[in-house]
Every structure is written in structure tokens, then in C-alpha cells.
Amino acid sequence: MEVQFENLFAQLSDLQPTSELDCERLKATLVNSCYQYLHCKPSGNYFIPRDHMDALKRLRRNEDIIISKPDKGNGIVLLDKVDYVRKMEQLLSDKTRFLKDNKEKDLTQQVEKAITKLLSSLKQRGIIDNNTYERLRPTGTIVPRLYGLPKTHKPGIPLRPVLDMVNSPYHALAKWLCSRLEPVKKLLSQHCVRDVFEFINTIEGMNLNDCKMFSLDVSSLFTNVPLKETIEFLGEFIEQNSIDVGIPVDDLKSLLFKCTENVQFKFNGGLYRQTDGVAMGSPLGPLLAEVFMAKLENNQLSNAISKCKVYKRYVDDIFVILNKVHDPKTMLETFNKAHANIKYTIEFESLDHLAFLDVSLTRRPDGSIRRTVFRKETWNDQYVHFRSFVPMKQKMNLINCLAERARKICSEDTLADELAFLHQIFLKNGYPKHLIEKGMQPRPASDKMLTVEKKCVYVNLPFKGDALAVFTERRLSSAISQAFFAAKLRVYFTTTPAVRLQHKDKVPSSEASFCVYKFSCSCGTGYIGRTTRRLTQRVREHHPAWIKSGVTKTINSAVVAHLVETNHRVNVQEAFQPIYKVNGRLPKTIKSRILETAEAIAIKLFKPVLCSQKQHIRALQLAWPTSQRSIDNRQITPIAFV
């Protein structure tokens, strides 16, 4: 908790305080608010009954099931583990897409070195600056993990394979490449819509007289994208159109191949490689899929598309309005001949009705289109229950967002029915009638006044009830606005899910990176340190192999010095433990800053003996009192947002 408040104050460092006195008052308020919030117990009004919690614990301990979320929609899905593994291995048995890595060796560190080498070359040639290099250079990453999401809306409940690329060596670079290629994507995507609302604007006022309406679906698009063909086409398009993406085309292609080709991943303890196609979960997946589809649409399919009155695509879902003189089945045959990798399926109107994305479209007798919100058959009337332990703001935002969504999707003759339906659904989910009516009111358009823009500073706190949340937010906002006129506070409250999903391979604590760790000797002497690399690498420096042989070599660690001087022996796995881990989804520069702060706070609070001579400890801005409590008994919450 202290890390959050220390980091909050650090975000104000580039602003001018109103006075030194107000700044010191703010510091005192932050320390006081931190410990007041830390010691407050969560409100008991929303607690899950004990028998319910016991049942959830039994589910978590049951090794014969997989706890997952559905591929689409809300809810929890319980899967038989044997059946889940069988379905996933059946997907992985496709030799044209996946390959079992028989070496059974995690090559993450080798991938880190290869990407670092490519980035170093770009930096040396002045293509990227040092800040970009440090931000993209992979450190302390883990092998991507594959999991499957059950498609509960389809017969047999097939699984959609998803690759968790967060904190992998490819992730930061892939996101950066996506940002560089966004202008190229916009130029290519003539037929693409960003969301359902852009789609509605496209068909607004359309008439279906003498026309046929149908949809096409691309089967398994991501895994069927031919990487080499797509990346080569992308490079040619950039060169032919003289698009400046800030990086030479040859280097761009090298980086794209490094992030997508032969990616090693883990499933059920085994290591595999994806030999072609892009993975669901990779930041580059949607971009390369979009580039490939645009290639087909602008070349092989351009003549067929030109015959359509409307042709709009969202990723792999396509909506078509075609004049009756043309045959949709002939068009389907043309599409299926466009590329050997890609197959399309077609869905026609049924009783003048067709669903596309979140919209249900109905042909009226006069040819106009009636619109309402579409929900799949598996939808279960479930939203966040009013008794759920989440902030009231989130509940009110849910009502307002769904009402606004209905106003944008529905036509005039269906809007009232949709709003009435939402009203009943929220009543079923425990919401009071007056809050539903309040939340469904249209938000008035706010007149933006021309004022000096303020810097937003952020703090993330575990949610402990609405009363405490409102009080803390008001107190912090008042103190910050008084000390720094140019600052604006944003407080984010997080909740811990009652049921944690269990569909990914667990990451061993020894592979933790960007973490603060503790060393506990058998004599009670302690040490606290930080590492951006994998913990196992840092531990080898604290406890080198030669320490057991009796041969003394160069000592550059307080832990090594202590063990050599005292001749104490420790169990490495028990002696070194991570006590704080920074959220892997944060940018690297922010993670590094938070990590330094977390280490400094831990040393300040617990004063481990072996850290007395430690150098390069981040200077703390707030006056944290020294704690006499054991670090073993202290709850340390990882940062989720900055």
C-alpha cells in the first residue's frame, strides 16, 4: 500500500507546489491516509456466506476441473480437465500450424538476446533513441502460455486457442510495431468498420428492396494467416506508397518475423511452437489479420466486392447487401477460391432476420431495416449484481453504458422495448428501481470550457466499500488540489475475484521478475533486494555454486559475504522468496520506477541487517514510520495500475 502513495507523490514531482507548507501537509495527509486505509476492514454488507466460500475453495482445490470464462459473454465455465486437455491437444496436433518442441528447453532468454541485438542495431544507426530502446528491450520475461476459451454457444463446446503474450519477450515490441503501423492499417482497410456503431452509421437509411442481405464468416482467421506472404505484402505496400513508419522496411520485416515466426509457448507443462499463422492474444494478431484480409479484398476479391451494394467487415465477420441479380452462393464460391488458407461460411436471412455483431436486423415490408440489440442464445441475463462487492460508480456506469448502447443501436420503433427489457434485467440483478431510472437517463452533453489542462495523477487502491472509497477519494483530491493547482487525481479501486481462472500454466515463483525479494538466513539475518530479471538469475549471484566447495572467489554481495563469514548453510528455495511483484501489464519504465520505490519502502519499514551498507536505494519522499512487524506477517499487495 505504501508503494501506491509514494508513487502518487512521485507523479507530482514535475509540478510547482503552491507553497512548501502545503506540500508538507500533503505528504502528511498521504501517509496518514495510507495507514488509515490499510487498517480499515472491508464493509461486511457484501461478504459472501461462509458455505459459499467453502464451496469455492473446494472448486479451486479440485484438480480434475478447469475454471474458465466463456469465449463470449459473462459467466464461469467448469470444464472436465481431461476433456479440456484432449481438445487443446487436438488443436495442437495440426502439424501445418503447430510443432511439439522436443528439446523441452525454455528459450526465452535466447529470444531476449536476439531481440535485444536487433534493437541495439536500430539504436546504433539512430533509428530509435535510447529511451525507446530501453522501453522495448525485453528483461525478465516468461514463455507465452496457451489456453483455450470454451465456445459455449456452439455444439460440442469447442475451444478457441488464446496465447497469453503479456510479459513475454515479444509483447512490448509487438505493441510498438502496431502503433507504428496504424497509419498503414487505415490506408489498407477500406472495407473495415471499427465497431458496431460505425457499422450502424453505414447502413443507416439503407433500403433492401430488390436486394439480398447475408453475412460471411472467415473460419479460424488468425491461425490461417500466412505470415511470410502477409509481411512481404505489407513491406511492398509501404514502399510503393512511400509511407513513413519511422523504420526501414527490411528492419521492420525482421522485427515482425521475430515477433511472430516460430513462437515458442507452453501448454500443460509441454513446450510447442507455432510455425504459421498469428496467435490470438498477440498484439500483432489483429493487425496482420487485417493486412491479409485487406490484401485479398483489394486484389483477388475486388471484382466480387464491387458488385455489392454494401460490404463491411469487422475482423472475420462480413456483412453484405447484394442486388438480387447476383447469386450469394456464386459469390461464396468466388471467395473460397481466393486463397488456399481461407474458407468462408455463409448465413442467410431467416424470416427476414439477420444478426451481425451486436445488432439484430429485420427487413420491413417497405425494405427499410429495423434494428435492435442482438443477444446470443447462451446469454444468461447476468450482469454485475447490485450486491456485488464493486464500487457503486461501476454499477451506475454499467446501467448508463447499456442504455446509451441501446440508443445508438436500436431504431426508433424498438428503443422503448429494449430499454424496458434492460429495466427488467437490472431488477433481476438486484438493482433498486430508482437507481435504474436514474442511470438510464441520457447524459447531457457537457460544454467543455477552455481552461488550462491539468495533469492527471493516479493511485490504485483495493476496494473496501463505498463509504471508505468516497471519503478517501475526497480527502486525497482536496489535499492534492490545495498543494498542486495543476494536478487532478484519479483513484482506481480494484476488487479481488471470488473465483480465479485456472486455465493457464502456473508461473513458478522462481521465475518472478520485476519483484522485490527477501533473503532469510537460518540465523535470522535478513536482506531485501530487487531484480528486473528472473529471480533465479539473481539468486545465483547471491548464492553462487562455488559457495559449497569451500573455495572463496570474488565477493560482491552482502548475502555471499554473510554466508562465507558465518559458514551458514541455507535451502535456496526457502531462503529466497519474492515478496512484491509489479504488474506485468505496465510499461517497463513505470515498472522500474515502482520497483525501486517498493524496495526502498520495504528496507525503510523492516530494516534488514544486511542492507545497512546497501547503496543505490531510491530516496523516499514521504516520512514512513519504521515498522516492528515481521515482513512474513505483512500483507503486500501488487500494483495493478499506475
Protein language model regions, located:
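Charged structural interfaces that engage phosphate-rich ligands
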Residues: 1-642
